[in-house]
Every structure is written in C-alpha cells, then in structure tokens.
C-alpha cells in the first residue's frame, strides 16, 4: 500500500511539472507571435512616403526658372513699375507685352510671389508682348531690361516706344557715363544717351518711310527707354548697330519673326517646370506605401500555411489557444485521476 501511495504521489508531481512546462511553452510562443505581429504592423505603418521627386521639382526646377529670368524682373523692376506707374503706362503703351507682363507679372508677382507671378508675367508677358514689341530685346533680356525700364521711367515713355516704335528700333549699349544729344538733318537717326545706368545709340525711322525726322520723339523715347533696351539687345540674335536707311517698314515683319523664337524660348522654362510642380511623385509613393500592407499580410499568411510558428500571425494564435485548451483539459483529467487514486488509497 505504501508503494502505491508513493507511486501515485510521484505520478502526480510528474504530470503537474510536465503540464506546467507545456503551458509555459505555448504561452511563450503566443506572446512572441503577438509581439512580432505588433512590431511588423508598427514598422509597416511607420514608413512615410518619400517626397524626393516633388522636392527636387519644386526646389530645383521652379527656383531655376524664377531665379534666372523672372526673379530680377519681379523683384527689382516690376515692384517699382507697379508702384510708380507701369500699371497704366506700360499697360496702355506697351500693348500686350508690358500689359500682361507688368500688369500680371508685377501685380501677381509682387502679390503672390515670383513663382506664380513671375512665371506667368515674365514668361507670357515678356515672351509675347516684349518679344514681339521690342523685337528680340526684352524677350531675351527680360531679367535686366524690364527691370530698369519699369524702375526708372515707365510712366509715358514705355507707351510710345514699346507700343509701335520699338519694332523698328535697334539699340546698342556703350559703357560710358557722359550725356550727349545729337540730332541729324538728313532724316536718318537721332542719338541720345542717359547717364543714369548706361548709354544707348538709338535710331528710329518714320513708319511711313518718307524719311522725315522726329528728333523730339526719338530723344524722348531713348531717354525714357534707355534702360529697357540696355541688356536686351546685347542678348538678342540681331546685330548691335544698324543704320536708319535699312530700317524701312518692311523690316518690321522680319523683326517680328525674329521675336517669335524668343517668345518660345522665354515660355519654354514654364513648360518644362510646370509638369514638375504637380507633385505626381508623392502620389506614387503614397499608393506604393498603401499597397505594402496587404503584401505583408499575404506573406504572413504564407508563413502560417508553411507551418512556421515563429513568424505566424493571428491564425496561429487561434491554434495556440486550441492547443492550450486541450492541454488544460488533459491537466484537469490527470489531476482528477490522481486525486481519485489518492483518496481511494488513503481511504
């Protein structure tokens, strides 16, 4: 009888320790699986969409287009033109170029910034208006030419010169600081230089082609618009100097044709920088990050079907629960059996 008692007691402790080990093992795997799933979800959700494409487009593309051609016009010249009188003067006299350029460029550019205003104003305005009106001058040199013209004398001077007269004008800048005014009698040219920024040799013919001289109008236009045509003609593709004899009204269509590629050249940075500012790269990265979540869940499901209990997700937690329940049932049965045997032996 004593032997049976001792064996029953030993059996009881053996099964108790065995079941405790099994329970601890299953509980540890369950905790590890839950911890691994939480880590995976946190890592998958903590990955932000990368904004490299949009940052490069907004940082490099728009800054380059607004920085080279249009920041100078909107920053220095167009602010002064809208403040002093380029809104009415250049709006009426400069036709469409300074009307759209100084009107929209300085209005929207000084109001909203060089990105929108200088992009539309200096791009469209200087491309179409000043490109066709001033030949190739302000089309290529919209950065410096339009600045000085709008800053110094854009009240009434830009009305006459940029409207009709600048089509038949050619100017060449000479680095001098004196002020000289000469008027010829043979109806060829009138030359005046301004000592404010730099000097210009400016020749103008009558649109009728009869050889009459308009010295007062030429002097007025060259004094008010000496800064308009300073850096613009040096950057154009036409020769710097040209006599008044060759400037018949038939030369105006050629100048308008020469201004057309400059308008396309000034509008080309906008066309290049416009699709970059849409930020389509961010949407692509965002959709990619959204599509990563079902991929992780599918991988976890594959690992669960393969039988890897360490990398398994929520499906194995159910299996662990069922195995835990089965082990608990076994544990209860063994305890009850040992208790019955012990009571039977002691009784």
From Swiss-Prot:
Keyword Transmembrane belongs to the record: no
Topology of this chain in the membrane: Lipid-anchor; GPI-anchor
UniProt keyword list: Cell membrane, Disulfide bond, Glycoprotein, GPI-anchor, Lipoprotein, Malaria, Membrane, Merozoite, Repeat, Signal
Annotated InterPro entries: Merozoite_Surface_Assoc, MSA2
Top-level lineage group: Eukaryota
Disulfide links within the chain: 304-312
Lipid attachment residues per UniProt (GPI-anchor amidated asparagine): 321
One term under GO cellular component: side of membrane
Role, per record: May play a role in the merozoite attachment to the erythrocyte.
PANTHER family: TRANSMEMBRANE PROTEIN
Descriptive protein name: Merozoite surface protein 2
Organism: Plasmodium falciparum (isolate Nig32 / Nigeria)
